[in-house]
A protein has these predicted regions:
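Acidic/glycine-rich phosphate/pyrophosphate-binding loops and surrounding catalytic core
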Residues: 2-206
Length: 209
């Protein structure tokens, strides 16, 4: 039991998790919406310049040293018939000019998806790399690197996944995960004490204050 600003609060030790795997169906649905946003099916440049019979091989190469994140979701970004070969695992260090993966199949399919897929992978690798830097700076201290809910709308689970791959921990996945009283709650509830009391009286068994 702790006293915060005169309010008695029972402290529960929070157990922070790591979202190191993304559900395949979730990824496919998100990628589908990203592709629709980009108009991939109506890619007039590719559709009018590349014959449907043309095959190609795309090579993913690291431009600089980074913590790789997102290769595990590549199979969910392309339809059947596209062959994906990864040479490194999520969480591993990619070296400059290192080949991370190869993608083989229909040139049209690969070309009308490449920008969406690359944008996502580059973002995830960037987050994982920056997280790893923070983790390495704090490895001699007794605390964990956590993310927040201040994430890109529509990309939350992907970005939390990247944090976990980089060695960090995930805080609240969403608003239903745990109680987190902030200034605006205190003001709206009429003070810290009534805010805490209302939550305690609600008997939310899974909530952490």
């Amino acid at each position: 039991m702790s006293v915060i600003n005169g309010v008695k609060v029972k402290r529960n030790k929070l157990q922070f998790s790591r979202l190191t795997n993304l559900d395949g169906q979730y990824v496919r649905e998100k990628i589908k919406s990203f592709l629709q946003e980009d108009g991939s099916e109506d890619d007039i440049t590719t559709n009018y310049s590349v014959d449907t019979s043309i095959k190609m091989e795309a090579v993913l190469i690291a431009e600089e040293e980074c913590v790789v994140a997102g290769l595990s979701i590549l199979p969910h970004c392309f339809p059947k018939g596209i062959i994906i070969q990864s040479f490194i695992m999520d969480g591993d260090i990619g070296k400059p000019n290192e080949v991370l993966a190869r993608i083989r199949g229909s040139a049209r399919t690969i070309l009308n998806r490449e920008r969406v897929v690359l944008n996502l992978l580059q973002r995830l690798c960037g987050i994982a790399t920056k997280t790893r830097q923070y983790v390495e700076c704090t490895q001699n201290y007794n605390f964990k690197v956590l993310d927040t809910r201040k994430m890109t709308p529509g990309l939350r689970m992907f970005e939390k996944f990247a944090v976990a791959v980089g060695g960090g921990y995930n805080h609240r996945l969403d608003l239903s995960t745990a109680v987190l009283i902030k200034d605006n709650h205190i003001i709206s509830a009429g003070g810290l004490e009534p805010a805490v009391k209302k939550i305690q009286d609600s008997k939310i068994g899974r909530a952490h204050v």
